Amino acid sequence: MADLSGIKPTAMTEYAHSPGLAFRSLVIGLTAFLTVVDLFATQAILPSLTRHYGVTPAAMGFAVNASTFGMAAASLVVGFFSPRIDRRTGILLSLALLAVPTSLLAVAPNLAVFTALRVAQGLCMASAFALTLAYLGEQCSAMDAGGAFAAYITGNVASNLVGRLISAALADGLGLAWNFYFFAALNLAGAALVYFTVDRVRPMHAMMPAASPLAATLAHWRNPQLRAAFGIGFCILFAFIGTFTYVNFVLVRPPLSLGMMDLGLVYFVFLPSVVTTLLAGKVAARLGTRPTIWGALTVAGLGLPLMLAPRLREVLAGMVLVGVGTFFAQAAATGFVGQAAADNRGIASGIYLACYFCGGLVGTAVLGRLFDAFGWQACIFGVGAALAAAALLTFALKR
């Protein structure tokens, strides 16, 4: 049994590596996988859901990604009260409750109910996500923190790949309803994993006098480096959502004309990201956060023109580059927030995640309108603008 609480607090082991880190990193990544597997898996069946509810791609894309609204709201609330929340209990309850809206999606009668259930999913996912990031920031040594955050983001990346493959296969073979029942079972598996691997640990900042949550929130926003990191997170998911939501409709239309199972297999494009994201912590530690993020954003930007090609090979190559670049940048930015916040890291993580997921919601709405009105090229232009904005914000981070 991997006891994650065995990772010593930063204040106690400032420069030491924690023993058994490799196995704990595996558990951390698996926890991340089971926490957010619902978030993007549904994108693999977007065309089928669009036909099922008889709506436009933009409307269905917004409904599926409404989970990001719940995630933004929950990230703020959980971050606000983070110093008073027991990490283990909060993560455990969030994952157990997540199974409820996930299973109800199987019987959602209309788009409004579907959207509301996706928001509820987001509330539960973000609560677990924010508390886990706060836990890692508090319990990892300075040397181990980058690797722990990278492992968590890698689990997130893996959930994008495996979740979409499973979703496409289940929907194709058993229908839409069984797809959601299966993911509800995965949510319960995540709760079980936390129950057996995470011991009860008091939030570090509950052990000492601390500023009020509002004062801590304002202090974080006054920090120009953290403020820039929050903006970078917004831009990253804006770009990611815009790319991987609406590319599904491009892939199933002529000249590519992929079927549902083929569409699921396309998401093997995330496989390189599973490997590269693990390196983000080491690269940022060696080169610095700014060069790391700039390099990652450049890689993502190089993929955009390829995705406009009429041939599947070029489109897939573009998807690989965008996936590798955005996930690498996200891992570097997430680790930066965890280390740049001198105190109240739970609140800082909550603000970052709220901005990150708000970027996803805004990206869905804005880029969906562009896609419906002007087509795929306009959508790609919007993605490029978001990546450029993130690159500019990176100038404000410390060297």
Task: State where each predicted segment sits.
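Helix-to-loop junctions at the C-terminal end of transmembrane segments
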Residues: 75-86, 276-288, 371-372
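Juxtamembrane intracellular "pre-TM" segments in multi-pass secondary transporters
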Residues: 10-18, 199-230
